[in-house]
Amino acid sequence: MPYRASVGYTNQQGTLETSKYERGTLDLSLSPNFFDKHLTVNLNAKGVVTSQRYASGGVVGSAAFFNPTIDPYFRNDDGSIDYTTTNGYWNYGSGRGEDFTPNTLLGAGPLSQLYDRDNTARAKRFIGNAQIDYKVHGFEALRFNLNLGLDVSSAKTYDGVNPGSFQAYTDTEARGWGQYSWTTNFRRNHLLEFYANFNKEWDIHHLDVMAGYSWQHFYSSDHSVSYFNETHEQKGEDSRYPFNRQENYLLSFYGRLNYSIASKYLFTVTLRDDASSRFSEDTRWGLFPSGAFAWNIAEENFLKDSRAVSALKLRVGVGQTGQQEIGSNYPYLARYYMSTDVYKTYYMGSAGHMFYLTPGAYDPNIKWETTTTYNVGLDFGFLGGRINGSVDWYLRQTDDLLNSVITPMGSNFGNTVLTNIGSMENKGVEFNLNFIPVQTKDWNLTVGFNGTFQHTEFTKLNNTDDPDYNIQTGSITKGTGNLLQIHKVGYAPYTFYCFQQLYDQDGNPIQNALVDRDKDGKITQADRYMTDKSPNPDFFYGISLKLNYKNWDFGFNGHGSAGNWVFNDFASANSTSNIDINAGNLPNFARLVKKTGFTKANSGEQWYSDMFLENASFFRMDDINLGYTFNKIGNWKGSMRVAFGVQNVFVITDYSGVDPEIPGVNGIDGSIWPRPRTYSLRLNVNF
């Protein structure tokens, strides 16, 4: 019986002090077959145990702004460390020992963030799968497949601060000793999938028909409780409602038909009927059809024997898909949310205290988001495949977009609601090219390049087609309201909505001087403008190269984008020295402060200036590898490859932030966390 077993262990030190990650894995696979291979069984089981300690993400920024002339420790008169004041780590504030008063405006120092906070997590996960495939005896063209899956995980997270730390002295509930919390998370996913497949060839015909059923159940449970340090007094939990439990179901009936004639003309039709418990009974089901046709031109008689053309296929298709991954399991239900603040309770007499229950916003008519895609493509190959690739034109029209939007005052129970907001169009051209310019006995060179030109815009956002209707989104650190971007018809998602900066004759920005676009003599929200700039690139691409010479191999991979914009929120939030100077401290100023010389308090509008909006086009060399393979070492019949590699080699960009590739979709950069460069030396041995 075929089987495979493996054991793995990973121990990785983080970029920051105190951060680390450990993982242990165990895999087992069994693949028996019965009845002359008509019945095949695949059993897979994988167990994973992880342990991780997190370092505070704010420590990088804190260290960058910390005054380098200050001793990072509090000292006694004899030079020893004064552990009675914030555990010895220097922090902004006044007084010493128990009389220490923290400067909450400037926050904890970098050493306190690193060593006086303990945030650890331990997790266990099991992934199991059993797949049974049966080919009917005497009618082998028909087979049945049953797939059963289970994914279970549990995690426990500890997050707390040390007594006597800066963080403990800023805790209004437990001043001086602080508190900690335990959070437990449980996830379980069941899968049952069954399908029948009929595959038959006769003469010049090939028919492949499949019909199936899929059922999934997702369950989650979360529980969190906080304690005061030292006294271990429990708080923050209502024992009557100790857990947050949620679940959802996904049900599907589906079918697919593939039919080809002489391998020249290929037809495909698919149909899915999906149901999600995240929607009400009236909108739960979604029907999503698709169809495609391909013409294998290279198989036609006029090209079949061509030496120049080795492959040529024309493809056209249209199809629909549904989206229900919205992050909420009950968006159509009216629900109440319980307060977690022990000071916000109702006194219920002998029943004790009950936490506040607040109604949440909901949409009883929320339904599937539907995307219709039109595609025309051409696959090609020339000179025996030494030049090959594809080019595709596509148009994606998404209707009933699912998103959270701000609700008009008094129209719902909450400031935002998850609902269907309108339609969006995405169109473009994507291509993939591969070349083999050199191919000899000793030399082989392969070059690949792929790219996509795209344009995305909203085509509808409400039922009245109001051209001025918009949805504000995209929070930044400073400012009133904090929303920097707008969804609006005719513009790309997350288009930046800024004030226009004024500059002096030398090109330097003038603090709090912005363009009065409506010419009413004052700067108001009406002076903001649609910049027509968004984080969505006009073009993104990838490049690869692989070179072989005898036993040597060399290669690299890179990718990049053009036309994408990023708002440097870190620069915006730290664009003036006013806060630091007024706090009576002299830390390291941000580079932008030194450049602009801003010393006044920024106006509420200055934070939204387009001076912080930057072109984030870039090219990143992802990795470079060089290796050598030893095929013969004495009488040994195996082989050995030694390779050296570098990941995150370099980035070419005009963006002033640390990294033009920022997490998330809205293009707002509020972090200065660096991406590591990794050097590796690898040894692969084959027996």
Regions inferred by a protein language model and the residue ranges of each:
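A generic structural motif
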Residues: 11-15, 275-277, 437, 535-537, ...
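Glycine-rich, aromatic-lined ligand/substrate-binding cores of catalytic
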Residues: 534-567
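Calcium-binding motifs, dominated by EF-hand helix-loop-helix domains
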Residues: 513-517
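Surface-exposed beta-strand-turn/loop segments characteristic
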Residues: 1-6, 10-20, 92-105, 581-582
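Acidic carboxylate motifs that coordinate Ca2+ or other divalent cations, activating on Asp/Glu
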Residues: 520
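C-terminal extracellular loops and terminal segments
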Residues: 416-425, 466-496, 527-542, 574-579, ...
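Extracytoplasmic gating/loop element in the C-terminal half of outer-membrane beta-barrel translocons
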Residues: 111, 276, 506-508, 561-642, ...
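Extracellular/periplasmic, surface-exposed regions of secreted and cell-surface proteins
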Residues: 23-24, 29-35, 40, 44-49, ...
